[in-house]
Regions:
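Rossmann-like NAD(P)(H) cofactor-binding subdomain of soluble oxidoreductases
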Residues: 1-65, 81
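General beta-strand structural signal in soluble alpha/beta enzymes
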Residues: 21, 46-52, 92-96, 154-155, ...
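Glycine-rich beta-alpha junction loops
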Residues: 24-26, 52-56, 74, 96-100, ...
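Active-site-adjacent beta-strand anchor residues
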Residues: 50, 71, 226
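Generic structural signal for well-ordered, non-membrane alpha-helical segments
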Residues: 2, 27, 31, 35, ...
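Internal alpha-helical scaffold of NAD(P)-dependent oxidoreductase catalytic cores
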Residues: 5, 12, 37-47, 65-152
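NAD(P)-dependent Rossmann-like dehydrogenase/reductase catalytic/cofactor-binding core
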Residues: 108, 115-119, 123, 144-154, ...
């Protein structure tokens, strides 16, 4: 939808437009990040920023304190986004690492599926802490190989977003993982979760990127095998 929307909007943009993406994902066939899609569809004529972080809309809408990162290769663009969105309830930090911010926002959904599977199988806090920490190491390795900064993955847009997505019942990806852990099939899980389970699609992209770059990602590979190779959850857990 991002590509189609950007394509339709491109002829309407004024020369002084700043493009901001709040969508978290990787395009399935091309493995492009959202800002790269915007750049393609608008001819690279506009500055682009990504706004990302642990920001479930349910809580933002209620005015609960929230923090995000505005990332752009253009410091002026990042500062403009910060100024536009920040208030006493919504803190915005800036970063030049749009690659790391976008990758961490997209790939953490795969880890949320894994944590949900743990919940569904009855595992508790120790197991999830182990899973989240080691999975973040995997994301760091892939992110660095793709041009991101390791420090970004340990910050608000990385570890912060990972924590909220892996622990909140607002998270569709975690809810989907719980159903898988309880023994539901992939088809049943996607139907019952409601809405788009981003981690389902991100798992395929992550698997392909890991193979292409030669990065070992055993935890994320297990999620991929459950989703796309029908590997039993109980077998993977062993």
């Amino acid at each position: 939808a991002v590509r189609e929307t950007a394509h339709a909007a491109a002829p309407l943009l004024r020369p002084d437009t700043l493009l901001v993406t709040a969508a978290k994902g990787i395009e399935r066939d091309t493995h492009l990040r959202m800002s790269q899609i915007l750049e393609q569809e608008t001819g690279g004529a506009f500055p682009i920023a990504a706004l990302s972080g642990p920001s479930h809309a349910e809580e933002v809408g209620r005015g609960l304190p929230t923090g995000c990162v505005a990332a752009s290769v253009s410091q002026a663009a990042a500062l403009t986004v910060q100024d536009a969105f920040m208030n006493d309830r919504f803190r915005v930090y800036t970063s030049p690492d749009i690659v790391g911010v976008e990758l961490s926002g997209a790939l953490k959904n795969v880890v949320a599926l894994a944590c949900g599977i743990c919940d569904g199988m009855g595992y508790q806090d120790n197991t999830k802490a182990l899973l989240m920490t080691r999975a973040m190491v995997e994301l760091c390795h892939l992110g660095e190989r793709l041009g991101g900064d390791r420090q970004t993955f340990g910050g608000l847009a990385g570890m912060g977003d990972l924590i909220v997505t892996c622990t909140s019942m607002h998270s569709r990806n975690r809810r989907a993982g719980i159903l898988l852990g309880q023994g539901k099939s992939v088809g049943q899980t996607l139907a019952e979760t409601g809405g788009v389970v981003e981690g389902y699609y991100a798992a395929a992209s992550m698997h392909q990127l890991a193979e292409k770059t030669g990065v070992e990602m055993p935890i994320c590979r297990c999620v991929y095998e459950i989703l796309y190779r029908q590997r039993p959850v109980q077998e993977v857990a062993r």
